């Protein structure tokens, strides 16, 4: 089980790759009067510098071993992040490929015209089954997964979260909801796994049915922040609120993008600080793990969205 536990990296050996932080402005294709939509901004960064060749090989929708997607249908909008478990590197396996393939399958299902976003956990189940049963199966590894959907007809948010990626919803400058982590033990999140050999019994194999599902009604101006643990392990909730409070009701994509950029920059800075008392360091202490103080270098992926309901005719 050792290679499914995230390694506590030597923080001095990693340099965050600023050049790999790619800016993206995305908004929903749905613009009909009265139809709810999410105005989205995406940003991220890899914890390790990548060459131009590596960037071309891993393609879009990846920041290191993190991956993400967004999709839109007449009835739903869907956002997802996955964090490949880096311990597989000891076996020469790039868990980022697993995360990317999982998100790719989620995107394919979520882009079907009839998809309504009411059951993101079933979306995760179907996507994992497709990945697991794909032939030839040349993808192995494991990752966390967090899916968030907007069901347009009743303006309701639905979610499915497995592991320690997560999301929070802010309204009027306060946290309305935050997802809970799922951990086997410290730094060992629940994870979906396809081992290189079916008989391999020394790896964690959690089920997508174990993903925690929630739903709550949204209001215009609500903010949804979806991210991998590279953000949450380094930026306390109070700092997140301070960064986002001024965005309440903001639906201009450029302002959301600037905020997403600031969040990633803040997480990168704190992740390499030797003196900051990070959420990760506090959790380590609570679990009697000798980590000391400081941040946790990691890949970071952030999707920031604001709910807009255009005026009805």
From Swiss-Prot:
Q: Which residues form the PPM-type phosphatase domain?
A: 47-307
Q: Where does Mn(2+) 1 bind?
A: 83-84
Spell out the reaction equation it catalyses: O-phospho-L-seryl-[protein] + H2O = L-seryl-[protein] + phosphate; O-phospho-L-threonyl-[protein] + H2O = L-threonyl-[protein] + phosphate
Give the matching PROSITE patterns: PPM_2 (PS51746)
GO cellular component terms, alphabetically, are: mitochondrion
Keyword terms? Hydrolase, Magnesium, Manganese, Metal-binding, Protein phosphatase
Q: Which residues bind Mn(2+) 2?
A: 83, 229
According to its UniProt record, the EC number is 3.1.3.16
Q: Which Pfam families match?
A: SpoIIE
This protein's cofactor list reads: Mg(2+); Mn(2+)
**InterPro entries documented for this protein:** PPM-type-like_dom_sf, PPM-type_phosphatase-like_dom, PPTC7
- Molecular function terms in GO for this entry? metal ion binding; protein serine/threonine phosphatase activity
Q: Which GO terms describe its biological process?
A: dephosphorylation
Similarity field: Belongs to the PP2C family.
Concerning PANTHER family, the annotation shows: PROTEIN PHOSPHATASE 2C (PTHR12320), PROTEIN PHOSPHATASE PTC7 HOMOLOG (PTHR12320:SF1)
Q: What is the designated name of this protein?
A: Protein phosphatase PTC7 homolog fig
Q: Native species of this protein?
A: Drosophila virilis
Gene name as annotated: fig
